[in-house]
UniProtKB/Swiss-Prot annotation:
Keywords, ordered alphabetically: ATP synthesis, Cell inner membrane, Cell membrane, CF(0), Hydrogen ion transport, Ion transport, Membrane, Transmembrane, Transmembrane helix, Transport
Organism: Rhizobium johnstonii (strain DSM 114642 / LMG 32736 / 3841) (Rhizobium leguminosarum bv. viciae)
Molecular function via GO: proton-transporting ATP synthase activity, rotational mechanism
Protein name: ATP synthase subunit b 2
Topological category with respect to the lipid bilayer: Single-pass membrane protein
Role this protein plays: F(1)F(0) ATP synthase produces ATP from ADP in the presence of a proton or sodium gradient. F-type ATPases consist of two structural domains, F(1) containing the extramembraneous catalytic core and F(0) containing the membrane proton channel, linked together by a central stalk and a peripheral stalk. During catalysis, ATP synthesis in the catalytic domain of F(1) is coupled via a rotary mechanism of the central stalk subunits to proton translocation.
Subunit composition and interactions: F-type ATPases have 2 components, F(1) - the catalytic core - and F(0) - the membrane proton channel. F(1) has five subunits: alpha(3), beta(3), gamma(1), delta(1), epsilon(1). F(0) has three main subunits: a(1), b(2) and c(10-14). The alpha and beta chains form an alternating ring which encloses part of the gamma chain. F(1) is attached to F(0) by a central stalk formed by the gamma and epsilon chains, while a peripheral stalk is formed by the delta and b chains.
Amino acid sequence: MFFVTPAYAEEAPAAATGTDAHAAPAAGEVHTETGVAEGGHARGPFPPFDSTTYASQLLWLVITFGVFYLLMQKVIAPRIGAILDQRHTRLSQDVEEAGRLKAEADAAVRTYEGELAAARAKSNAIGSAARDAAKAKAEQDRRAVEATLSEKIKAAEVRIGEIKAKAFADVGAIAEETAAAVIDQLIGGTVAKADVAAAVAAAKKEV
């Protein structure tokens, strides 16, 4: 930014006047030179480096910085602060929501695990009761079958004893008759029936 001071403003017309004096020759004069006069542009230092303009430059610098500072303080900084506060509030809400959802998920997991453990315990109890009932029923059926078989075995043993006794009785009579016939054929005589019965009885005892 360039600043025009009164000193530079006074020098500018003088330079312009000097230029006009060179540009407008008197009547009747003929100039054959084609060079450009630069004396007017060489007067004075470059405005930003002119020591006479330092005060005004510092003043405008302070004014510009003050305006920029007020703009930052009144407009930009509040907007940035509001955005940061909004983001902080949003993050806090998101963190709270995440914590709430995590707590609900943990509670749901604990409830599920509790229900699963209860279901397993109930299933084990039902299985154990079913096994015990089946075992008791099987034991009862086994005992009933054993009792029935025992009764049948006893009845069969009695029947076998009766058949055996009858068979032995019949065998004894047949043996006596057969022995009498054999003796009669061998020695050609008869033997007393009591002797034959005694011999058969002795043979039965040996068997």
